[in-house]
Amino acid sequence: MNFKRKVYSRLLEWKEKYSDKYAVLLEGARRVGKSTIAQSFGENEYDSCILIDFSKATANILECFDDIANLNIFFLRLQAETGITLYEHKSLIIFDEVQLFPKARQAIKHLVADGRYSYLETGSLISIKKNVKDILLDTPIF
């Protein structure tokens, strides 16, 4: 329980100080509660939260990442597919098990630079490094 409180307080610090400039990555072993903490944080600290679990994502969700040149369309498609409304500067988008879908990892810098929403990623660091070794990352790791 103490671990979860510590992570949650670090996420609050990230939200307050860095979420407009950086995504955050929660990394760790499988089944330690990363997804649960991420979802709880999104539900409690933001007006809305979209969780994309790449271990279960539909083909339609994955297709959203095929062309992110037009972010207006990208965000409209995400909202349509999830049924969740995004609010600028008040919504969190969670990429869960991000190591399973490198296109999302590639897109994160572009999405953060857009500045409309906050981004939290979860995954196994070993798997992330293996699957995205050629992608430049600009994400603090907690």
Predicted feature locations:
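Phosphate-binding site recognition
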Residues: 1-142
